Amino acid sequence: MHIEIEPTTVDQVADLRFLYARELDDVIRYEREIRQGRTRIYGVWNGGALIGYGILHGEGEDRNTVVEFFLLPQYRWHTVPVFDHFTKVTEAAGVQARTNDTGLVLLLYERTRDIVPGNFYFRDAENTPQRTPGLRCRAITPDDLDVLTPIMTTSEGWPFELPDRGALATWIESNEGRLLEDDEGIAGIGAILHGYNAPFASIGMVVMKRARRRGYGAYLIEEVKRETYAMGKIPRADCAPWNAASRATLLRSGFLVNARALRGTLSAQS
């Protein structure tokens, strides 16, 4: 084999990424960042033929963590040496993989150290009707801008926190936001995040502090799930390892843990 690793574009590896998505059968975590040009993409060529690709992401400008790596099946006997060449050329420093991304997680165990767990990833398993009278769930509209600004531009709006009113107005126009209301006003905010690989959408929610421990979160998740399916998409979700409350809410809403994120530091190559 004569392997070459060269920068490329997301369009040039689109067919390979389609095969990768079919094998993963899950939402691709960094799909939005990839489409926004916030990653580094490299093709893997053998004698001029494109046989695979890899993508690196990271915090800030340090895009040195491998988050996708794929080779066509007939070349996978050579996965480890090709990966070693890939990480050397790209000056990769680490690997991040989900436990259901079999190819990359095996490379993570084979070639990294100091492995630490990260987010939990969930798939929907069942419908769990939530009986919580007096709640209303609806789409967020431009008329909600004033009332949402003091929430969504502060830490209370996390994980949907936005930097300013203008960014919030843009987000509202995307039609991703959902509002949960009770007799006292805004009780929670949900989201159906588009822009991921078909047929998946990532969903999320936050419940206002005054409305917590009432079952509102599970109700909101079920409503957002129902609407996601009505759009012809399959809902997926994730949460941080420290967020036990959100994890419990997702489980109560019919989700099951589908995978766990792992991150490791690449060992020095001789």
Features from the language model and the residues they span:
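Glycine/small-residue-rich hydrophobic helix-like segments
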Residues: 176-234
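Short amphipathic alpha-helix that is part of the acyltransferase structural core
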Residues: 1-27, 127-161
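Acyl-donor-binding surface of acyltransferase catalytic domains
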Residues: 58-63, 70-135, 264-266
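Conserved donor-binding loop and adjoining core beta-sheet/short helix segment
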Residues: 28-90, 187-202, 206-209
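Conserved active-site tyrosine of GNAT-family acetyltransferases
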Residues: 107-109, 250, 255
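Conserved acetyl-CoA-binding loop-helix of GNAT-fold acetyltransferases
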Residues: 75-88, 213-228, 247-252
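Conserved GNAT acetyl-CoA-binding A-motif
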Residues: 90-101, 228-240
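Active-site rim helix/loop that mediates acceptor-substrate recognition in acyltransferases
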Residues: 21-41, 157-179
